[in-house]
Amino acid sequence: MKVNVDMNSGFCFGVQFAIDRVEDEMKASGPLYSLGDIVHNAVEVERLEKLGLKTITIEEFKTLKNTRVFIRAHGEPPSTYKLALENNIELIDATCPVVMKLQQRIKEFYDRGYQVLIYGREGHPEVIGLCGQCNNEAIVLKHADLSDRGETEKIDFSRKTVLFSQTTKDTTGFYELKANLENVFREHHAAQNFDSAATESIVPDFQAKDTICRQVSNRDQKLAAFSKENECVIFVAGRKSSNGKVLFEVCKDANSNTHFIENQSELERAWFLRPDDSLVESVGVCGATSTPMWVMQQVAEHIRATFAAERFVQS
């Protein structure tokens, strides 16, 4: 049984920058607070905490004064920076450049009077930071098919509107949502304007901005191809990782024999067996943009040592 590791998987540049930065800061100045998990991968967080990183919540952050706090790649809302200034907290800011640019664009459109929609997950750290750019007035849409009335009833279809996306969401879902919103805006306009001579200026201004990180979206095809090349796929990611959920589905769609794990202890013998109890010929190990390469390598080595050995075949 051959075990292959997908070398295109692993940290995106934003996460890698944050990890490198926090390690450098701790080497130079000792232990450091991190506002929230630096990455949505429990194994990597545990490794960094052993080096001196202390993860804190926003409530704990509010009690701190005269100290240093690390801002992860997900970014933060303006209120975090205001509080830091008031409490003499030095922020080591590792906000991903892609996220930072998105924050700026959302603020620009909001300041121009646009209703802001965000394709993403309510409560996700990045989304919290994005909503903060528009006074928390953004409407977050999780369902591309507009099936959740609780989400859609908040939208004012008479206003000029712009749609953005959380950077780690799937492109397929974004463009499905874009098309569905365009249809609803068009229907709403038609219902409000029965006069065929109505001018185009009456049509509400709806724009959609694809702000999904290309390091995320470009992995889709590569992961799908990698999954098809292997008889069994082990996808490694943190349970909290939004990107992990998206990329796992990409692998699962390409190869039904795909399994999600957070670490090697979750591996199951049955995954590597065919219906006739013979071993699969190849296993592919891959992961999310928040999955360290060392964890995937560790999983691959465990599979080789435990499941691909001759003694396993004979057992």
Swiss-Prot record:
Its EC number is 1.17.7.4. It catalyses: isopentenyl diphosphate + 2 oxidized [2Fe-2S]-[ferredoxin] + H2O = (2E)-4-hydroxy-3-methylbut-2-enyl diphosphate + 2 reduced [2Fe-2S]-[ferredoxin] + 2 H(+); dimethylallyl diphosphate + 2 oxidized [2Fe-2S]-[ferredoxin] + H2O = (2E)-4-hydroxy-3-methylbut-2-enyl diphosphate + 2 reduced [2Fe-2S]-[ferredoxin] + 2 H(+). Dimethylallyl diphosphate binds at residues 40, 74, 124, 241-243, 290. One of its GO terms (molecular function) is metal ion binding. InterPro entries: LytB/IspH. Isopentenyl diphosphate binds at residues 40, 74, 124, 241-243, 290. Gene3D superfamilies: 3.40.50.11270, 4-hydroxy-3-methylbut-2-enyl diphosphate reductase, catalytic domain (3.40.1010.20). [4Fe-4S] cluster binds at residues 12, 96, 213. (2E)-4-hydroxy-3-methylbut-2-enyl diphosphate binds at residues 40, 74, 124, 167, 241-243, 290. The keyword Zinc does not apply. Keywords: 4Fe-4S, Iron, Iron-sulfur, Isoprene biosynthesis, Metal-binding, Oxidoreductase. The keyword Iron-sulfur applies. Binds 1 [4Fe-4S] cluster per subunit. The active site is at 126 (proton donor). It comes from the Bacteria. Pfam families: LYTB (PF02401). CDD domains: lytB_ispH. NCBIfam families: ispH_lytB (TIGR00216), PRK01045.1-1 (NF002187). HAMAP family: IspH (MF_00191). Belongs to the IspH family. This is 4-hydroxy-3-methylbut-2-enyl diphosphate reductase. It comes from Chloroherpeton thalassium (strain ATCC 35110 / GB-78). The gene is ispH.
